[in-house]
Curated annotation (Swiss-Prot):
Gene3D superfamilies: DnaJ domain (1.10.287.110). Residues 252-270 have a biased composition (Pro residues). Keywords: Chaperone. Coiled coil: none annotated. The keyword Kinase does not apply. It comes from the Eukaryota. It comes from Schizosaccharomyces pombe (strain 972 / ATCC 24843). The lineage of its organism: Eukaryota, Fungi, Dikarya, Ascomycota, Taphrinomycotina. GO terms for biological process: ERAD pathway. This is Uncharacterized J domain-containing protein C4G9.19. Residues 239-270 are annotated as: Disordered. It holds the Pfam family DnaJ. PANTHER family: CO-CHAPERONE PROTEIN DJLA (PTHR24074).
Length: 270
């Protein structure tokens, strides 16, 4: 238990020293986002993220709440007020410097950081309260003063939500593109099957026509011939079809002359 009190005293003393260094709101709000995060202007995105997590854990209002409950008479009321304001500015500074475009605009033109040191811009209270709700004592007393609340009220949650929405939009667009490509492939397949079927029907019709022509070619005049004559004529036409190219084959032949009956010889009378 003594170790716990010792650590809480260290936390309370560090918070008191931090608050004592800013004797008024004007001095606290005159700091730049780099000064809030205790980083140089040449810091990288990883430096900002690392320092932000470190300072959030160090200056979270829940720590001050626990220290005030254990030793309320030793904690001046200005500490809570100053640390809440500092924590709010910490969230705003991280939101600004984590955005590459806004950070470049701030470095060049001094915009996006609406502090009293820039009188041409609106007051910081209206700007910050719309994006970063202050940590109210009533919410803390109701058990709502957790790190999750600050996360959902901070710019980190907004960035995560925006990234999630962008990913969801990208997934939806990807599904639409995939569905479009699949539809095109199905249409191409159906059209290809239609063309193949049409070609097959035309080839089949042409083959049937050629078969009918060949049948007419071989069967013309067969009805008027005897069985032996039909066999002889078929053999002759088959031999001729082997010698004559198909494209030069006549479509029909004139009917053969009807064979005359052999003359009968008179029988001698006895």
């Amino acid at each position: 238990m003594s170790k716990i009190f010792f650590r809480l005293n260290l936390v309370r003393n560090s918070l008191w020293r931090r608050a004592a260094s800013f004797t008024s709101y004007s001095e606290l709000k005159s700091l730049t986002p780099y000064e809030i995060l205790e980083l140089p202007r040449t810091c990288t995105a990883n430096d900002i993220k690392r320092k932000y997590i470190e300072l959030v854990k160090k200056h979270h209002p829940d720590k001050m709440k626990n220290a005030s409950q254990l030793a309320p008479t030793e904690s001046p009321p200005e500490i809570n007020k100053h640390n809440e304001e500092y924590f709010r500015l910490l969230l705003a500074a991280n939101a600004l410097l984590s955005d590459k475009r806004r950070r470049e605009e701030y470095d060049r033109f001094g915009i996006h950081w609406n502090q009293p040191s820039h009188p041409t811009h609106p007051s910081p209270q209206n700007w910050s309260q719309a994006r970063y709700p202050t940590y109210s004592r009533s919410r803390r007393s109701a058990g709502m003063g957790s790190w999750e609340e600050y996360y959902y009220n901070s710019y980190d949650y907004m960035n995560d939500q925006n990234a999630s929405n962008k990913n969801r939009k990208f997934d939806d667009e990807g599904m639409l593109v995939f569905a479009g490509i699949l539809s095109i492939l199905v249409i191409i397949n159906i059209y290809s099957n239609y063309r193949n079927g049409k070609f097959y029907r035309e080839a089949r019709s042409a083959a049937i026509g050629r078969a009918e022509d060949n049948f007419d070619y071989y069967s013309t005049g067969m009805a008027d011939l005897s069985k032996d004559d039909r066999i002889s004529r078929f053999l002759i036409l088959r031999e001729q079809s082997k010698q004559i190219p198909t494209q030069q084959k006549p479509s029909s032949l004139p009917p053969p002359e009807r064979a005359l009956p052999a003359p009968t010889m008179p029988t001698p009378s006895s």
